[in-house]
């Protein structure tokens, strides 16, 4: 992982709402969750959630897919694994 990509991902997670969103998606697993379920679980207005999901997506921490009427978001475990490898390489 390039340093600039790591900085972007870590910066995205350094915000409480985005970290909570990402943790929820990690717990949900590869199947992910609909945006409406995320907003409900976190008690977050849909417009705020949309902003945070966009930031997480720009940092390659989440991916989205259309499923019927819903947009499903899921954590990108490959990105987090790459971040963890950076830490492991320097221990």
Predicted regions and their residues:
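N-terminal helix-turn-helix DNA-binding core of bacterial DNA-binding proteins
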Residues: 4, 9-45, 67-79
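Alpha-helical residues within the helix-turn-helix
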Residues: 40, 57-58
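Short, hydrophobic-biased segments on the C-terminal half of alpha helices
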Residues: 53-54
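A short, conserved structural fragment
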Residues: 60-63
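Conserved small/polar residues in nucleotide/adenosyl-binding loops
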Residues: 89-91
């Amino acid at each position: 992982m390039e340093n600039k990509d790591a900085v972007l991902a870590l910066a995205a997670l350094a915000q409480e709402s985005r970290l909570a969103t990402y943790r929820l998606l990690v717990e949900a697993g590869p199947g992910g969750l609909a945006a409406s379920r995320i907003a409900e679980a976190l008690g977050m207005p849909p417009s705020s959630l949309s902003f945070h999901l966009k930031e997480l997506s720009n940092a390659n921490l989440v991916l989205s897919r259309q499923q019927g009427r819903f947009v499903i978001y899921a954590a990108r475990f490959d990105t987090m694994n790459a971040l963890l490898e950076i830490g492991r390489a320097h221990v």
